[in-house]
Structure formats: C-alpha cells, structure tokens
C-alpha cells in the first residue's frame, strides 16, 4: 500500500537501474522501460530466474517475499493492472511486462514459445494425480476451460486446448483425428477426457489459434517450479481462496492504481482514497469522481486507505453498503478534501461524491426515493383503489353514479347493441338487461378492471360490475336524454336504496321489474337516442363510470338497481336496441340469472359460476356479447323481464 505512493518513484529508480534490475523483483516491473535497450541481455537472465531451478527467477517480480511481493507485485501489477485496463497504450510500452523488458516486447509481438509470461500474467498452475495413467497432471485454466498437461510425457489435452480457442466441435474433432500421435481418453475426470497430443503439436495449435499467452504457463518447460515455488503456491497452486485473499490485499493498490491511471496517474498518493471512492463510485459513476477525488484525496490518501481496504472488495457485492457507507465517507472525505484542498475540483468531487453516492447506493439510497416516488404513484393508484372501495362502500352513491355516468357508459353499450341489433325503439323496453350482459361482454373488461376492487369473485364481480355499470349507465343514460332521468333518478334513488337495502344483487333482474315500469317507459322513449348519443360519451363515461359504476361493483349493482334497477333491466334497451326479440335467451338467463345476476352482482356463487363459465367460454364479459345470437338472448331477456313484470 505504501509503495503505491512511491510507485512512481519505484518506477523511476527502476527505470534508472533497470539494467541492474534483473536481480531485484521490483525492477522487473520497470524493466520494460530500460530493457528496451537491452532486451537480449535481460531475457536470458530473467528467463533463468523465472524458469530456472530458482523459482525466485519467475517470482523475480516477487523476490521480496510473498507479503512484500504483493506490494511489489501490486506496484508492478499496478503498472500491469492499469496496463490491463489501459492495455492498448500501456502494453504498447513495455511497462506491462512484469518480466524482462525484452520479453515484454516479445509478448507484445506475441510469444510463440509459451515460456514468457504475458504482461500482468501470474502463473496459476494446479496439479492432480491421474491415477489411471499413473502420472501427475498440471492444469492451467483459460477462459473457464481447464487444460491439462502430463508430467511424464508432457502430452497435452488437445480437446480442451482447442476449446479454449473457441473452435467448433466438428473442426476440433477433425483436427484431432488427423493427428498421428494422439492418445484418446474416454474415462476419467472431465478435464482429462479427450484427445491428448504431443507437447510440440499442442504448442503449434496454441500459436496458430493465438492462445499461447492465455494458456501460460501451460507450455513453460519447468512448469513444476512454478507449481511448487512457495510464492506461487500461495498465489496460484493453493487455489482460488489464496488468490482471492491476495487479490483482496492487492486490490486496494491495484484498483487504486488502475483508477488512478484512469483518473489521472499524477497523484499516486491519493489512490487509496479515490480508489476507495472510485471503487465505490465505480459502482455508480466510478470514473467521474476519481479525477476530482484524486486531487483532494492525495493529502488524505492514507486515511482513505483504511476505508479503501474495508470497502474495496465490497463495492460491487455490497454496493448498497458501499453506497451508504460511501455516501457518508465520500461526503466526509470530500469535506476533508475541500478543507485540505479547496481546489475547484473538490467541489466537483463533493458533487461527484453526492452524485456517486446517489448512483452507487442506487439500491439503498435511491430505493427510498424510488419508494417515495413509487409511493406517490402507488398512492395515486391506491387512491384509485380507494375510489373503488368508495364505490363499493356507498352503493347508493354508486347508484347515483350509475344514474349519471352509467348513463354515459350505458350509451356506448347501447350504441353497440343498438347499431348491431337495430330497432332503437324497442331498446327502451327489455334489451337493457340482455344488453347489459352484451355490454358486459363489450365493455366489462374496462369496467371489470376498474371494478376489480370488489374482492368477492373478482371475475364475477368484475363481470357483474361491467354489466352493472352498463345496466346502470344505460338506464340512467336513457333517463338523462329523455329527461325522465329525473323520475329515473327518483326511481333510481328509490331503487338504489331499495336495491342497496335489498340485495345489491341487482336490481338487475328483480329490481328491474320493481322499478322497471317507470324506467322502462323512460327507456323506451329515451333509450334509443341516448344510446346513439352514448357512444361518444360512453367511452369517456365508461372510463368514468368504470371507476364509478364498475367500482361500484357492489354499488354499481346498486346503481343498476337504483337508476336502471328495474327500468334498466326491464328496459335494458339492449334488446330493443339490438333487436326486439333479442330477449329470448336473455329472458331465460334473466329468469334463471336474475337471481343469478343479483348474485353475480354481489359476487354470489351462482352468478360467479355462471359468469365464470361465460368467462371460460370466451372473453370476460364478452360471453354475452359473444353469443352467436345476442339478439335472441336479449329478446329472451326482454321476454323474461316482461313476463316477470
């Protein structure tokens, strides 16, 4: 971590001492700078160190010992890691190579020997005993594929090798089948199955597919040294846990250096802080703040290191934690930075901190705002629901709504049957009830949705609601245009109390006869015109009435009873509008369903079952409208209503 600050210094001395660096691990990272001049000299030595019996040669960059290696490697990796981030530019300059500068150039040109570690690449080798073959197998993972190499004859699993290249199965198998020397393994662990080919052929394939560097150190001759070297054991052979721990230790540095490079390599001291922030910010808007944070943080870099250590790994997984913590920390640090460096950038850093905190903790921080915002919409939606309960709660009022708006909505319903069925004159008498269902079929969906609030058998209620608002709407509609609306309203009011007092069930069937006389007459006169008038307003009113009439789910039914309770159903001008005789089926349904319909309005089982059946049979509420002979149904309904009357 401390090296991070001297990191630039480290590079400079190493650059100056690069010629001497080969022996010292740190110089290797910098060796790329000076080595370009002496690539040939350094390469043999470093290779010896790397791959020679001296494992230190390879860890060459890690000579300082594992703990120090991490910083050293981190500094090198920092050079390397940033290079990985900015690999195009960084790699273009040898800096990427932690190994000899000459090799770095070779690696950039592409190493065909497999002996040179690509820039920033660490040897990661594991070994397992292949009991069936009686040999150790060295395993290197690349692109999620484990490629194995035998220790005794150094053959390599060509199948897995070509899988790393992303080769198709057919092409891979064709190439492997053409190999003269091959060993097919069909039994054993998955990573050992496949066609094994000689080391030289495997290297040729790797070079041809340009995956040699990705497979490093699979082709290193003394791969065992990499495996068994203590530093490498802790880093590579030990496994993911060790690597994860090492990464955690290195991450503050490497991440800091990376972001430092990205943000601005000028302040090597700051990395800790803005890494801390930049990492957290990286979650939200990583790059935006680091530049600002870098300058302010340099002075406060150390303190931030602690936080950086605590935060660096979490940010991604604990973005919410990071966001919250970072918000606080970013604010604090920004404030501190402001005090320390009241530069123009610091306010930016503060702002960025805020914005980053916002963006970073999007989950925690923004969720409350999101929740609030959503709460507002939810509130509105709830209020909408509230409107539904209101409709359902005060059925009498719903009847009023039905009287007023249902008339409007009724128009559209009537308009549909009217246009379809025809004689508007008769519409006034019976059709309404038949049509209510038809309209239910037509309109109910919207109403149902609106009316959905009534909990009991939403389908039924909704369906009923749709019919009810339609009935109510239709009835009041006719009344409104005729001016009978007054009497209708009176009837409606009477009906609505009666209906509400009596079963909300509807005045649809039963109430219709009771109040139908007035309403029917009114319907007869007014219904045709209102129906025609209704369509334009019906859509609007349906929207309106859906909440009012449909939401009335219960109230809507009351409203049906109230405004059109008897008159609507009796007059349910659907049959007249649709056709005089449309009531036939409807009448039957009404007879059977009048009880049913009130029930359905109430969400009773019979109504619910019937409506459910209709819903199952076809679109919700459209079942009536969908009936092949809506006119007949309405006629039946009219006949039944008339008979009852």
Curated annotation (Swiss-Prot):
KW Zinc (keyword) present: no
Polar residues bias: start-end ranges: 254-271, 279-288, 336-365, 502-542, 569-584
GO CC entries: nucleus
PROSITE patterns cross-referenced by the UniProt entry: HTH_APSES
Phenotype caused by lack of the gene: Alters growth in axenic culture and impairs conidia production and perithecia formation. Abolishes the pathogenicity on oilseed rape leaves and results in a drastic decrease in expression of at least the three effector genes AvrLm1, AvrLm6 and AvrLm4-7, during infection.
GO MF, any single term: DNA-binding transcription factor activity
Record domain HTH APSES-type: where: 124-230
Skewed-composition ranges (Basic and acidic residues): 586-597
Localization (cell): Nucleus
Residue numbers spanned by region Nuclear localization domain: 585-613
Induction conditions: Expression is induced during mycelial growth and at 14 days after infection, corresponding to the development of pycnidia on oilseed rape leaves.
DNA-binding stretch(es), residue numbering of this chain: 158-179
Annotated InterPro entries: EFG1/Phd1/StuA (IPR029790), HTH_APSES_sf (IPR036887), KilA/APSES_HTH (IPR018004), Tscrpt_reg_HTH_APSES-type (IPR003163)
Gene3D superfamilies: Transcription regulator HTH, APSES-type DNA-binding domain
Composition bias, Low complexity: 18-52, 317-330, 469-481
Its job: Transcription factor that regulates asexual reproduction. Binds the StuA-response elements (StRE) with the consensus sequence 5'-(A/T)CGCG(T/A)N(A/C)-3' at the promoters of target genes. Regulates the expression of several effector genes (AvrLm1, AvrLm6 and AvrLm4-7) during infection stage.
Family: Belongs to the EFG1/PHD1/stuA family.
This protein's name: Cell pattern formation-associated protein stuA
Species for this entry: Leptosphaeria maculans (strain JN3 / isolate v23.1.3 / race Av1-4-5-6-7-8)
